[in-house]
Amino acid sequence: MHLSEITHPNQLHGLSVRQLQQIARQIRDKHLQTVAVNGGHLGPGLGVVELTLGLYQTLDLDRDKVIWDVGHQAYPHKLLTGRYDRFHTLRQKDGVAGYLKLCENKFDHFGAGHASTSISAALGMALARDLKGEKFKAVAVIGDGALTGGMALEAINHAGHMPKTNLLVVLNDNDMSISRNVGAIPRYLNKMRLSQPVQFIKDNLEEQFKQIPFVGESLSPELGRIKEGMKRLAVPKVGAVFEELGFTYIGPVDGHNLEELITTFQQAHQIQGPVLVHVATVKGKGYEIAELDQVGYHAQSPFNVATGKAIPSNKPKPPAYAKVFSHTLVKLAEQNPKIVGITAAMATGTGLDKLQAKLPNQYVDVGIAEQHAITLAAGLATQGMRPVAAIYSTFLQRAYDQIIHDVCIQNLPVFFCLDRAGIVGSDGPTHQGMYDIAYLRCIPNIVIMAPKDEAELQRMVVTGVNHTSGPIAMRYPRGNGHGVPLMEEGWEPLEIGKSEILRTGDDVLIVAYGTMVYPGMQAAEILSEHGIEATVINARFVKPLDTELILPLAKKIGRVITLEEGCIMGGFGSAIAEALMDADILVPVKRFGVPDVLVDHAEPNESKTELGLTSHQIAERVLQAFFKQQVSAVV
């Protein structure tokens, strides 16, 4: 059977190990070739091919439910559940999503994009099953560092207290998250992986006994007791934590041995109560380049399969915002030993790996634990340190209570650096950084800013590090800057709450924030071609707003446009509208940003076009909103 013939995972039933191995090779090839063209997550999926095949051969997936944590390790799952023919559209607009979506496929039982949610979701399904008297298996596959997340441990704590609730947790242990795993739990799991020689000896006892002359066959009845004794000897050193928490622990199992995996899963399904199967895998398995560089090949832009090297663009690009942030922070940290960079398992993505390499004592990676990261930062701040928490906008949502309770209420000087703010592209709605303006600006004490370009980002990094009177946040986008000149040192901090006028005109006021400043300026030039002159303000700060500058201009000009790359509801435009209303300035305001919709996976420019946020679309919308009759008369 060829992979392309599989439209339902139950077609794996009855296939031999040799046939499954052939399917495994085809999955890896399709996975590799697709990601090489489209970009996407590479290492996680390559590492779970045999795990997926072995698990699915032992389940009835018309009935049983498998919940994949995070979702980036589920590419093999997608290839086995009727999406082979469309897999070439992976992460493209209207194509197969890079993560799991309930609406995409009936075998995607729970959406995912953030880590550590699978055990909670699977346990909820198991409880619903028991309450309704239904019969199906609930399985959570968790790994790639997600077990370091507090939510996963909370779910394990709860599940272990329910000995009559059947739940299978499959721990995909590849000793990695996105970067190398950190913390006591991964260290404990690593010790368990090192116990595999004991497991190997135990599994091969029968063959060894048979080779004993004269008495080998007669010893076979004793084999079960000897194996159980070895288990008792090994479990206190290996699976003791999970056993003490109420789980039956099985493992470690070789995650690339199909025969062993199938046997293990069959045994696990027979056990009453919560079971944890510990599967040891290799991230990037089957593609040697990815195996040797598991951090670099966690996810990839399009690359050459033969060399593993990224396909170069046609022209040089300016440095990425994350790179400029990293370079600036390292320079400042070299001068100020109180600066401490904090990441939640995203050292490479945020650029803090450069700080780790240069100043390891001023760097902390807490693992996938955003809540802990923020309260850790608060603790550092109480002792006069300058904590810089560099976290993707979408992941900071997970620490909202800590932002309010531990930082803002106590008015502690924590510097939040929100990478990937705004439209992020092909990762889809779970990763869009749409909500940070709205969820942060309602909190007292916090200052919030966003740079128009990479040079202004440098000044904002200095501003954030120097701001000691309370918390401050900076949001900045994924991708490359505008190519403006950068300084190596001597950056001047900005005055808190002060904006700048970039262009003057009497017909319309455009107040732009962050990444929308450049499109706002370009839209103003297009409007000028129609005889309409705009004043353009780079707001810089959404909190506090520069009301001294913005309000008089709004009153004088009488027409206001706000631009932001974030949700309109509660966002930057709402802040402007509220300020005008509070000052009794009754002028028309049009807010351009992301409406009350989820932005699906697509290239960022495709999403911006769909949302009407390109410079030409902004100009057209301004004309339609305020100058329709005037333009019609000219035409």
From Swiss-Prot:
Cofactor(s) annotated in UniProt: Mg(2+); thiamine diphosphate
Function: Catalyzes the acyloin condensation reaction between C atoms 2 and 3 of pyruvate and glyceraldehyde 3-phosphate to yield 1-deoxy-D-xylulose-5-phosphate (DXP).
Known catalytic reactions: D-glyceraldehyde 3-phosphate + pyruvate + H(+) = 1-deoxy-D-xylulose 5-phosphate + CO2
PROSITE patterns xrefs: TRANSKETOLASE_1, TRANSKETOLASE_2
Entry-linked PANTHER family: 1-D-DEOXYXYLULOSE 5-PHOSPHATE SYNTHASE-RELATED, 1-DEOXY-D-XYLULOSE-5-PHOSPHATE SYNTHASE, CHLOROPLASTIC
Gene: dxs
Binding site for thiamine diphosphate: H72, G113, H114, A115, G145, A146, N174, Y287, E370
GO molecular function ontology, one term from the record: thiamine pyrophosphate binding
Domain of life: Bacteria
GO cellular component, one term: cytosol
SUPFAM superfamilies assigned: Thiamin diphosphate-binding fold (THDP-binding), TK C-terminal domain-like
Textual note on the cofactor: Binds 1 Mg(2+) ion per subunit.
Residues annotated to bind Mg(2+): D144, N174
Keyword terms of this UniProt record: Isoprene biosynthesis, Magnesium, Metal-binding, Thiamine biosynthesis, Thiamine pyrophosphate, Transferase
Keyword Metal-binding recorded: yes
Name of protein: 1-deoxy-D-xylulose-5-phosphate synthase
EC numbers, comma separated: 2.2.1.7
Similarity section: Belongs to the transketolase family. DXPS subfamily.
Enzyme class: transferase
Entry keyword Transferase: yes
InterPro entries on file: Dxylulose-5-P_synthase, THDP-binding, Transketo_C/PFOR_II, Transketolase-like_Pyr-bd, Transketolase_BS, Transketolase_C, Transketolase_CS
Biological pathway: Metabolic intermediate biosynthesis; 1-deoxy-D-xylulose 5-phosphate biosynthesis; 1-deoxy-D-xylulose 5-phosphate from D-glyceraldehyde 3-phosphate and pyruvate: step 1/1
